[in-house]
Amino acid sequence: MITPVSGLALAGDATDAAKLAKSYQLWGGIRTNHVISSSGSFVDQLGSSRGLSTPEDLDLLIELRKLADLVVVDAATARNEKYKRLSHAHLAIVSASGDFTSIPATSATDKVTLFSEAKPTVETAGVDHHQIASVDPFRQILLWAKGLGMSSILVEAGPRLTKICFETTKVSQSAITFTPKLPRNAVNGSMNPFSPSGELVSLAESTDASFTLWSY
């Protein structure tokens, strides 16, 4: 059960993940998505975000993917989270080194594209690959996506690639889930690890998480 608190969530009477995602509305450009612990960590002790997530957060992630044309993830996250081909959106996996080993999605025959500066270190037959500059990958990914008519991009990367995304491109929004739930008066710009100037446009909560949407 999700309780809408303010902004878009409250206006949309978002009492579950599907309604919350719908209240966020469609977007153009880049929306980033993250789950973060109250201490600011992006991963658990096993190096995965799954240990931080909650059932409602996972449901929200699925709903946000349904609204996206393209999901972008770094290879390390795709490996740790065992990413597979997505049912709704196209999946782009980014690696500076070209290491795409142990990622289930690389066995897909469609809807998956690999991006790296170096050539892939493993055989990825049937999967499209593009060589790009690792210092500014998003500019090239955006051009590629635009050419294919993809306008709504969801970035699910870790903090390093997300930081590059903010430095080199225009990010429209960030959907950030905090676990466990934060006191309502503690949800402010200082909690946003990417841009303290972001405007909080939506707040909702469950028993163990705070769901926020920031606009830039």
Language-model-derived ranges and their functions:
Residues 1-216:
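Enzymes that bind and transform nitrogen-containing heteroaromatic metabolites
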